[in-house]
């Protein structure tokens, strides 16, 4: 199924690598990791982002926007999946006969000699990767989100072992060289990449699992339930005595796992206990049980995943959930958190759908996912993520929520302003607000745009 890339990164020391789309979370992670390995990094993107600012602070030269003049005899060009053949920098690299790699192809070179704990699934992979990196602090880590433990999406280590968040959206997880394949779920998404062929989609997961020496799976998933090869298996019944507490004002889940005793992990919800359990089971051959138990406490959450931005008169949470399953699970966590805080405030949801294709593919589930634990729904325009706009009558589809439609939300001090046509139509000064989406809602809620 895999074709080995014709261009391989060999000696990284002083290798000149240019990243097109360097601001993306996946590409920026590779750029940080390779810079730490001794490579000379440059890059470009269409706009300034936190990742771009971070890399510039490290001394990386970055062009905004893309500029063919930035291509000047680098050893290799690596580009994100969203970059097309007609990109000016791609065209210039071809003129200069500089090797060009997609992120997917570059992964093969970067990971082929590593002992990779590769985490992949529709939901929970960032959290599991960050939890496992907390449990195994001597491992390197490349995560698709910022771990609050070390305030980055990358942790460099001389150790051959690496915790890696793999990506099924472009099938690049197949290039991650898994020593251990860790899969919490396989709910179909990104089917456009697989030609809307479910058989092809599930075959990719099977290939990923089959080519790992070690497999850790959650058998409540319909596909994983039928997986027949040797694996470390987690089932719902293996996790019990789940309780939720506030510790020093922070939310934690305590639970017992199989016959391994009790564990405590930052965050709330059954899904949080499941994610932590998969990380624990993945590490059993790496450390003793007490080290695992203690190191898990170093996990402090990840940016944009139940990210508590403030907790005063207005409790404000930012969450990356952009699929109905994720939204439903996180809303349950929000209700648990509200109960722990003993607040009587309504839970207000601000939702920014991410991609027209995802919204249309999951429309019926989106229409149901706010039914529990959402007292008021506020809807932002769809974040297209470069997709062509489609006409979707959200007012009709979501009328059963009596939603409020706005153009954007603006953080002003400790308050939130709701805007339509650049006019403030409402100010939220107190209450419990959670924002959902993988687009720019995170910057709106943080007052960064």
UniProtKB/Swiss-Prot annotation:
The protein's Enzyme Commission number: 6.3.2.8
Keyword set includes Nucleotidyltransferase: no
A Gene Ontology cellular-component term: cytoplasm
NCBIfam families, per the entry: murC
Keyword Cytoplasm among record annotations: yes
Protein name in UniProt: UDP-N-acetylmuramate--L-alanine ligase
Main location (coarse class): cytoplasm
Recorded catalytic activity of this chain's protein: UDP-N-acetyl-alpha-D-muramate + L-alanine + ATP = UDP-N-acetyl-alpha-D-muramoyl-L-alanine + ADP + phosphate + H(+)
Family stated for the protein in its record: Belongs to the MurCDEF family.
Protein's cellular compartments: Cytoplasm
Top-rank EC class of the record's enzyme: ligase
GO molecular function list: ATP binding; UDP-N-acetylmuramate-L-alanine ligase activity
One BP annotation, GO: cell wall organization
Function: Cell wall formation.
């Amino acid at each position: 199924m895999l074709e080995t890339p014709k261009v391989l990164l060999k000696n990284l020391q002083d290798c000149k690598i240019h990243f097109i789309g360097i601001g993306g979370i996946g590409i920026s992670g590779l750029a940080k990791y390779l810079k730490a390995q001794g490579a000379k990094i440059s890059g470009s993107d269409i706009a300034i982002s936190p990742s771009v600012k971070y890399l510039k602070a490290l001394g990386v030269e970055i062009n905004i926007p893309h500029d063919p003049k930035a291509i000047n005899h680098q050893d290799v060009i690596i580009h994100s999946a969203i970059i097309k053949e007609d990109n000016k920098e791609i065209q210039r690299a071809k003129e200069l006969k500089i090797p060009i790699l997609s992120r997917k192809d570059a992964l093969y070179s970067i990971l082929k000699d590593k002992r990779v704990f590769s985490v992949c699934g529709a939901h929970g992979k960032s959290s599991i990767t960050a939890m496992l990196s907390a449990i195994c602090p001597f491992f390197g880590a490349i995560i698709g989100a910022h771990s609050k433990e070390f305030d980055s999406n990358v942790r460099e280590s001389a150790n051959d072992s690496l915790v890696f968040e793999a990506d099924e959206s472009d099938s690049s997880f197949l290039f991650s060289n898994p020593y251990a394949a860790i899969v919490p779920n396989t709910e179909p998404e990104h089917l456009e990449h697989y030609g809307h062929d479910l058989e092809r989609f599930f075959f990719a997961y099977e290939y990923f699992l089959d080519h790992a020496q070690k497999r850790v799976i959650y058998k409540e998933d319909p596909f994983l339930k039928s997986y027949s090869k040797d694996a470390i298996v987690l089932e719902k019944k293996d996790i019990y005595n789940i309780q939720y507490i506030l510790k020093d004002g922070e939310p934690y889940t305590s639970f017992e796992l199989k016959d391994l005793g009790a564990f405590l992990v930052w965050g709330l919800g059954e899904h949080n206990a499941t994610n932590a359990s998969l990380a624990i089971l993945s590490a059993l051959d790496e450390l003793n049980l007490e080290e695992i138990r203690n190191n898990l406490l170093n996990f402090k959450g990840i940016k944009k995943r139940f990210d508590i931005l403030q907790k005063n008169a207005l409790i404000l949470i930012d969450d990356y959930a952009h699929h109905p399953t994720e939204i439903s699970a996180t809303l349950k966590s929000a209700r648990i958190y509200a109960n722990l805080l003993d607040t009587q405030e309504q839970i207000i949801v601000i939702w920014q759908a991410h991609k027209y294709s995802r919204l249309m593919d999951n429309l019926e589930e989106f229409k149901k996912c706010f039914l529990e634990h959402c007292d008021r729904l506020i809807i932002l325009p769809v974040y297209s993520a470069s997709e062509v706009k489609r006409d979707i009558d959200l007012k009709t589809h979501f009328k059963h929520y009596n939603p409020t439609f706005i153009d954007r939300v603006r953080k002003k001090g400790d308050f939130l302003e709701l805007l339509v046509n650049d006019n403030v139509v409402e100010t939220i000064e107190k209450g419990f607000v959670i924002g959902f989406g993988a687009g720019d809602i995170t910057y709106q809620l943080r007052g960064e745009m």
